[in-house]
Amino acid sequence: MSRISIEEVKHVAHLARLAITDEEAAMFTEQLDSIISFAEELNEVDTENVKPTTHVLQMKNIMREDVPDKGLPVEDVVKNAPDHKDGYIRVPSILD
């Protein structure tokens, strides 16, 4: 029994604005099903004596101090934009 249906794959593709064929949907359904099966196998692993961790490695990200600085002049920023108005960059609408 498949853990994910072709309809669910097509729905997710639609939400991501991806056009996929029926053959691709079937292929992705098989691939996602095998990924989900593998993830379910992890639930069977005995982790009784494993202490919880948030990072596998002991490395840490060391960030520099965030120092506010003066930005670029608006004129310099908008001169490279293909379309701008009143100091704002105009972009095509992506929402219906």
From Swiss-Prot:
Protein name, entry field: Aspartyl/glutamyl-tRNA(Asn/Gln) amidotransferase subunit C
Q: Which Pfam families match?
A: GatC
**PANTHER family hit by this protein:** GLUTAMYL-TRNA(GLN) AMIDOTRANSFERASE SUBUNIT C, MITOCHONDRIAL
Q: Which domain of life is it from?
A: Bacteria
GO terms of biological process kind: glutaminyl-tRNAGln biosynthesis via transamidation; regulation of translational fidelity; translation
The family note in this entry says: Belongs to the GatC family.
Specify the enzyme's EC class, one word.
Answer: ligase
Entries under HAMAP family matching the protein: GatC
Task: List the NCBIfam families hit by this protein, alphabetically.
Answer: gatC
Q: What is its EC number?
A: 6.3.5.-
Q: From what organism does this protein derive?
A: Bacillus licheniformis (strain ATCC 14580 / DSM 13 / JCM 2505 / CCUG 7422 / NBRC 12200 / NCIMB 9375 / NCTC 10341 / NRRL NRS-1264 / Gibson 46)
Q: What does this protein do?
A: Allows the formation of correctly charged Asn-tRNA(Asn) or Gln-tRNA(Gln) through the transamidation of misacylated Asp-tRNA(Asn) or Glu-tRNA(Gln) in organisms which lack either or both of asparaginyl-tRNA or glutaminyl-tRNA synthetases. The reaction takes place in the presence of glutamine and ATP through an activated phospho-Asp-tRNA(Asn) or phospho-Glu-tRNA(Gln).
Output the Gene Ontology terms for molecular function. asparaginyl-tRNA synthase (glutamine-hydrolyzing) activity; ATP binding; glutaminyl-tRNA synthase (glutamine-hydrolyzing) activity
Provide the assembly information: Heterotrimer of A, B and C subunits.
Keyword line: ATP-binding, Ligase, Nucleotide-binding, Protein biosynthesis
Q: Which reaction does it catalyse?
A: L-glutamyl-tRNA(Gln) + L-glutamine + ATP + H2O = L-glutaminyl-tRNA(Gln) + L-glutamate + ADP + phosphate + H(+); L-aspartyl-tRNA(Asn) + L-glutamine + ATP + H2O = L-asparaginyl-tRNA(Asn) + L-glutamate + ADP + phosphate + 2 H(+)
